[in-house]
């Protein structure tokens, strides 16, 4: 059955090791493969309704007063669509990560987080197409991606595919960017200092769903894990 083929779109916020932001978020959105086209068309129709160019990328960084109507309606669409699920892992302080102790680098850690992100919801009777936002084409990055796929495959009877794509080619990848951006924004406590009222409205709209963005949320629609590193 085509409902048993699941597309998963993964991305991150503030994952670079040496950037100023200490909070890292890795997140994904998923839905049945046979719903991708209709959902994408719905999002494009929303853009048209709000006079946004159909090829304009949806991003958390683009949330503004002039576009608040679109982003609030997009958020409502996500919560009302029964086929969409979101999950995020928040690393509150990546500066505390001790990579040498675990014989890894930061890029390896990123793919470990992708594994933790997806392994949580794997079902034996489903196959998965996993798309990660394209960051780099290095040999090591490709190796880590293939290893991640292999580890996930060990927990699933059906085939798992994993590849990189660019976000501008996928409405669902862009929707994930929007939601994970909200999670990262809140966990960086920027909601306490921002002058961007539109972003505050998005945060408040999420909170009306009884979702707490800086605590573990075992929520079927909007799942959050606050990740704490093991000590060595």
Can you name each region flagged by the protein language model?
Residues 1-232:
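Phosphate-ester processing/binding pockets and catalytic centers
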């Amino acid at each position: 059955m085509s409902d048993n083929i699941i597309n998963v779109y993964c991305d991150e916020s503030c994952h670079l090791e040496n950037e100023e932001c200490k909070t890292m978020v890795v997140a994904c959105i998923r839905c049945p493969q046979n719903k991708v086209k209709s959902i994408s068309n719905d999002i494009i129709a929303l853009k048209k309704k709000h006079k946004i160019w159909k090829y304009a990328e949806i991003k958390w960084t683009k949330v503004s007063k002039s576009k608040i109507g679109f982003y609030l309606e997009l958020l409502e669409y996500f919560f009302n669509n029964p086929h969409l699920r979101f999950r995020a892992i928040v690393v509150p302080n990546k500066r505390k990560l001790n990579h040498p102790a675990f014989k890894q680098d930061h890029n390896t850690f990123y793919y470990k987080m992708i594994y933790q992100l997806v392994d949580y919801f794997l079902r034996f009777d489903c196959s998965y197409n996993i798309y990660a936002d394209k960051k780099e084409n290095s040999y090591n990055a490709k190796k880590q991606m293939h290893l991640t796929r292999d580890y996930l495959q060990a927990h699933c009877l059906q085939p798992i595919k994993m590849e990189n794509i660019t976000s501008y080619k996928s409405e669902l990848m862009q929707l994930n960017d929007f939601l994970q951006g909200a999670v990262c924004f809140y966990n960086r406590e920027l909601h306490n200092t921002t002058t961007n009222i539109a972003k505050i409205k998005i945060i408040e709209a999420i909170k009306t769903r009884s979702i707490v963005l800086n605590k573990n949320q075992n929520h079927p629609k909007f799942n959050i894990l606050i990740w704490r590193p093991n000590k060595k």
